[in-house]
Amino acid sequence: MRRSPLKTMLTVLAAGCVLVIQAPIAAAAAAQASPAGSEWPRHGLDSAETRFSPLRAIDTASVAQLGLAWHFRFDRPRGVEATPIMVGGTLYVSGPWGVVYAIDARNGRLRWQHDPQVPAGKGIHACCDVVNRGVAVEDGRVFVATIDGRLQALDSSDGRLLWSTPTFDPELPYTITGAPRVADGLVMIGNGGAEYGVRGFVSAYDAATGALRWRFYTVPGNPAEGPDGAISDLPLQALALPTWQGEWWRYGGGGTVWDAMAWDPELDLLYFGVGNGSPHDRDLRSPGGGDNLFLSSIVAVRRATGEYVWHYQTTPGDSWDYTATQHMILAELEIDGAPRKVLMQAPKNGFFYVLDRATGELLAADKYVPVNWASHIDPASGRPVEAAGARYPAGQPFMVQPSQLGGHNWQPMAWNPHTGLVYIPAQENVGFMMKEPDFRLEPGRWNTGVPNPPVPPDAAIIDQARQSMSGHLLAWDPVRRSAAWRTPHAGPWNGGVLATAGGLVFQGVGGEGLAAFDARTGERLWQSDTWLDILGGPISYELDGEQYIAAAAGFGSSIHLSSSVLLPRRGGNAAGGVFVWKLGGTAPMPEAESLPMRAAPPDTGSATAVRRGGELYARYCMQCHGAGAVAGGGIPDLRHSPYLAEASLFRRPLVEGLLAARGMPSFADTLAADDADAIRAYVVRMAHITRTTD
């Protein structure tokens, strides 16, 4: 929903009728603050986050000649989601745990490396792996945010630490996985952790000194404790507080700003997307209802001060984990014969939004994937018209589309002003939503209020679940408000997108490496199998007259960890890296690394033990070790663990803390010995059932 600027924030404005969008503005106007194109200086190439490269040497005619120029391997496993930055002939890329690598962009030689030395135990608070989506570079400084909440500035020439500042208390279950954004001397960063019961905020720091300049909290705190003394105090009091009920602060509230931001230098507005509530089920966190601002909202603030300007809430009172943290693109479209500055987003809830980015006015909202939780977005109010039963009242489960994975997750999309199309890594899925019986808050643990049912020990059911999910590259026309084309993929979890002036769209395809598609038709023109999945956005740059395509690759991310059993190629413990292609490249592709395999112990668990073990596994183990006990990204696969051989061995890391120093927490305060034995029985059963998936 749209709200007025701060000075009239108590007045609710009508969104008005949806206007007819006529045509995109010329390409030169669409890529705001766009560089010449030889470098890739920002996360989304430019401040508008278009991810559109003007380079055209690699085009639809020449792309078949692309070959590997070089590759660089990281020195540790876990998830890789970064978009590289290329400035001054150096490629800056972050790997797992926020380790930064500076690499010669011509030949792949390491120039320097910075390891922030994050304690291994902090990984327990990372819902979706210890990933890092990238760095920011400006004025000779490289900025990176670490999993344990430090924002650091490094010397771009040698990696020396220039300053480091904590952005939150590392003892709290916050994390950071997002890339910082730099805008006119300020570095902006948010955080994650809503599933663990935190309160979200975004902060701006002085790029030269690391001093905090402003902070904007996205949900209200405990009213009894008074205001925060932050720039968000007034909008929280006037707009957000009336939309919450009960004692939401006991659960944290959520609303973390864990990914997308964009900046309009002309308006000098910073836009950020806000995440889901904590817990997910609104009836738990806010009994009595309410929109729960600013959850699932796009918020515009003044860059220099953080002062609130407007917001639009994509999913009022979110109960489905429908974040608005997905990639936002700034562009100009012609509406009723006049140019309008717009913001475009395809958030998890399945609707594609076009907003006036100066005012927050809703211009269009249309389904881009199958959606059943709402029939449409009402153009007058800007609110979704919800389906009966969508909020899964007690005793009435609901099969929701999209699922909590969303129609589009964090993987970046791209905008091509020449074709007038937005290219989206879209996905179709269904989620089972029901209230968690006897919910109890477990501080520092996974607290969504929605149970994770265990994967049953039945190969046919697993195959059905696999078939219920799909992914595709979607070309969306914001003028016609419809899909121009869709190209299906083999699996549901695919990578970010790069569009180029050569008429190409590059995307990482799950289980298949990097592929290039015709931007006008969606035809696949080229593919290179890296055997490591590419999830972050590919980039393009030019050196010595040659155009390069680069992408970071690796196993990890939330789906590799939690749902690898559903993917066409499951991950492993291999370290990720960077792959770079050019026309005529002849470097050999590194060979795929084999997965460690062990014979499963005899399956002697009773049906009761396996059923109970599956429930416990889904609650405490699945998020890291994978649904159905099939792991997929740097964390050991328990089916092949030496500790699985005997019950007494299996208890040692689980309840005795044997591997705590390596990041495996002890569950002694939660699980008894017989609980550990039941979990082992489930893992052994799944090892026998899923052995063919390896």
Predicted segments with their positions:
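Extracytoplasmic beta-rich repeat domains
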Residues: 72-83, 113-136, 161-179, 217-260, ...
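C-terminal capping alpha-helices of c-type cytochrome domains
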Residues: 145, 668-694
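Electrostatic cytochrome c docking/interface patches
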Residues: 592-616, 694
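Short, conserved, GDST-rich strand-edge loop motifs in beta-rich repeat architectures
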Residues: 189-200, 245-246, 272-292, 397, ...
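Blade-level signature of beta-propeller repeat domains, shared across WD40, Kelch, NHL, RCC1
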Residues: 539-595
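Gly/Gly-Pro-rich "capping" loops immediately C-terminal to redox-active cysteine motifs
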Residues: 614, 626-659, 663-666
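Blade/loop signatures of beta-propeller domains
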Residues: 31-68, 227-235, 386-388, 462-463, ...
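Repeat-blade elements of multi-bladed beta-propeller folds
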Residues: 40-44, 79-99, 124-150, 175-196, ...
